[in-house]
């Protein structure tokens, strides 16, 4: 199974989820300065323009190689890149893992909730996905709130599941199924 970029791009009047552009480099640079984003994603911790552009190209490649889809979370009015939402295929057929981040200047406005709701509903209703899941550290209360506010169901606690810089961490599992959509 592969995913193609939604056409037209997904929007709810607050955010637009679109393909990464080379002009989004400032967003990648700001994300690289946040210690938590590079720790849990592929955003380069040591930012250079070349590394930032290579990261954007790798995001394009996710769709091309069937790995999943990486979308920019952008302001609907200005088109300014504010973060990312990613859905990646997992071993179980029809299952994707969702991940997301916002640069610090974009936090506190529920933009992640808008993005997660848009892409999860698109995946379940239009892209043939059967299950969207997320793994969140117990300490990441903000991310748990994003998932819960968008209808994800908390399923359980996995001990020593996540790996960050060779350190293991617990994870809370969330999922959203087509039957959860209202």
Task: Annotate each language-model stretch with its function.
Residues 32, 41, 63-64:
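Hydrophobic residues in alpha-helical segments
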Residues 61-66, 152:
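Short loop/turn motifs at secondary-structure junctions and domain boundaries
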Residues 51-54, 66, 101, 169:
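A generic membrane alpha-helix/interface feature
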Residues 1-35, 70, 74-182:
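Acyl-donor (CoA/ACP) binding surface of acyl/acetyltransferases
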Residues 36-58, 69-71:
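Conserved GNAT-fold acetyl-CoA-binding loop/helix
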């Amino acid at each position: 199974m592969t995913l193609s970029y939604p056409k037209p791009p997904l929007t709810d009047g607050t955010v637009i989820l679109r393909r990464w552009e080379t002009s989004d480099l400032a967003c990648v640079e700001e994300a690289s300065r946040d210690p938590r984003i590079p720790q849990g994603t592929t955003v380069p911790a040591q930012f250079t323009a070349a590394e930032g552009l290579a990261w954007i190209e790798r995001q394009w490649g996710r769709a091309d190689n069937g790995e999943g889809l990486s979308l920019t979370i952008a302001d609907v009015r200005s088109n300014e890149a504010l973060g990312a939402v990613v859905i990646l295929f997992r071993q179980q057929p029809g299952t994707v893992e969702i991940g997301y981040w916002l640069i610090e200047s974009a936090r506190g406005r529920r933009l992640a909730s808008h993005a997660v709701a848009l892409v999860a509903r698109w995946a379940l209703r239009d892209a043939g996905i059967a299950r969207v899941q997320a793994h969140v550290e117990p300490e990441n209360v903000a991310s748990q709130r994003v998932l819960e506010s968008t209808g994800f169901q908390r399923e359980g606690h996995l001990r020593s599941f996540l790996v960050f810089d060779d350190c293991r961490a617990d994870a809370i599992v969330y999922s959203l199924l087509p039957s959860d959509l209202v």
